[in-house]
Amino acid sequence: MSLYATQDEKKQAAAKAALKHLPKGGILGVGTGSTVNFLIDLLPELQLEAAVASSQATADRLKKLGIEVVDMNHVGSLDAYVDGADEIDRHMHMIKGGGAALTREKIVASIAKKFVCIVDDSKWVDQLGRDFPLPVEVIPMARSAVARKLVSLGGDPVYREGVVTDNGNVILDVFNLNILNAIDLEKTINNIPGVVTNGIFALNPATIAIVATNDGIEERTAQ
């Protein structure tokens, strides 16, 4: 029997458990997505100096709670970055980008001293990419050319119709990739001309994962 009646209750529990890993009174990097939204609603407890948002949607939600949102260009580093994941494995490698904010998420995470990932256990996987397609942000004019390159890597790219990123680009969701070496594949895809970035977060993995399971909260680090 689960401690939680719904998946949303798991997400809320993970968000609450993450608070102790986040700085009080500092500047926090904040990700995007349904789990992060539960966390944002708790952030007033931390009395943050400010936040750097990874998307316009996150910025809007933070501002509604009275939390100042600052431009990343005015911040040298962040004490922590907190975000969810579409998938995460035992190496703390992740697939992100279901909400199409992967590029800004990756940029904000890159200046943080630690990356706190909050998920429910449905996102914990043995191998990335088996169940969730890999999002790739692409400059619009390069969509077809990039898609052909992704096919040559063994993937099955699908254009995410009707979605434009905050950066004005499009998303290709790549199915059936065999992600055995996440670091190498992240580099390979990012080197395709026209790719802005892809949703593998392996070069800059999570520091700790806060995982809500049926039995409660687990804190996991790389194995």
From Swiss-Prot:
HAMAP family from the UniProt entry: Rib_5P_isom_A
UniProt function note: Catalyzes the reversible conversion of ribose-5-phosphate to ribulose 5-phosphate.
Keywords of this entry: Isomerase
Name this protein carries in UniProt: Ribose-5-phosphate isomerase A
Gene3D superfamilies in the cross-refs: 3.30.70.260, 3.40.50.1360
Keyword check for Isomerase: yes
Pathway: Carbohydrate degradation; pentose phosphate pathway; D-ribose 5-phosphate from D-ribulose 5-phosphate (non-oxidative stage): step 1/1
Recorded family membership: Belongs to the ribose 5-phosphate isomerase family.
Any single Gene Ontology cellular-component annotation: cytosol
Reaction(s) catalysed (UniProt annotation): aldehydo-D-ribose 5-phosphate = D-ribulose 5-phosphate
PANTHER family named in the record: RIBOSE-5-PHOSPHATE ISOMERASE (PTHR11934:SF0)
Any one of the GO BP annotations: D-ribose metabolic process
UniProt gene name: rpiA
Gene Ontology molecular function terms on file: ribose-5-phosphate isomerase activity
Active-site residue numbers: 105
Sections of the chain in a coiled coil: none
Quaternary data: Homodimer.
Binding site for substrate: 32-35, 83-86, 96-99, 123
